[in-house]
Amino acid sequence: MQKTELDDQKLVEEIARRIREILELLGENPEREGLKETPERVAKALLEMTSGLRTPPPQIKVFSLGEDGEAYEKNQIVLIKDVNFSSLCEHHMLPIIGKIHVAYIVSNSGKVAGFSKIIRIVNYYSSRLQIQERLVEQIADAIMNSEIKPKGVMVIGNAIHMCSYVRGVKDKEAKLVSVAYRGLFKTNRALQNHVFRLLDNANKVNLL
């Protein structure tokens, strides 16, 4: 069903009404100066940060490296690094903020993905209540099953979780690293290590 502006406005109104109730339960006055527009702002922010639940997944635009696929049988790796992402932890609805690195092995047909499309896939699966371990798996599956038909996909996530930063243990330094492997990356440790070396070398020359 096609989404309309009327649908969006109704969602904002319904969510804002419940945010007002939450503010009251917390002991706040949602009518005081400074909070009058907060429920609507929060509603719009939540809808934006969970937009992936209500929109279709982005399609990967395919480009060809050439007509002779034989040139790509040596497992050429494409690495898209430092894709900034933010999501909402599904346990506490607090932000997860970090970076995603995506590597894939070009198929023998020489098909590669449009650069921005990989970023859109990261944004799409980040825009929902999420856990980081699932996020990297979903990104890996989306690319592995796309029209570029890569021989393998490797997705690395590195992020700070506000649920442990501002509450609970309140650790300001801890980061979570999660990795998903598909195809050749799943069984070939040399290929895995090659990607880690690429990231490490980029860091050494101040490219990270």
UniProtKB/Swiss-Prot annotation:
Zn(2+) binds at C89, H92, C163. Its EC number is 3.5.4.16. GO terms for molecular function: GTP binding; GTP cyclohydrolase I activity; zinc ion binding. InterPro entries: GTP-CH-I_C/QueF, GTP-CH-I_N, GTP_CycHdrlase_I, GTP_CycHdrlase_I_CS, GTP_CycHdrlase_I_dom. GO terms for cellular component: cytoplasm. SUPFAM superfamilies: Tetrahydrobiopterin biosynthesis enzymes-like. It catalyses: GTP + H2O = 7,8-dihydroneopterin 3'-triphosphate + formate + H(+). Keywords: GTP-binding, Hydrolase, Metal-binding, Nucleotide-binding, One-carbon metabolism, Zinc. It is an enzyme of class 3 (hydrolase). Pfam families: GTP_cyclohydroI. GO terms for biological process: one-carbon metabolic process; tetrahydrobiopterin biosynthetic process; tetrahydrofolate biosynthetic process. HAMAP family: FolE (MF_00223). Belongs to the GTP cyclohydrolase I family. Homomer. This is GTP cyclohydrolase 1. It comes from Saccharolobus islandicus (strain Y.N.15.51 / Yellowstone #2). The lineage of its organism: Archaea, Thermoproteota, Thermoprotei, Sulfolobales, Sulfolobaceae. The gene is folE.
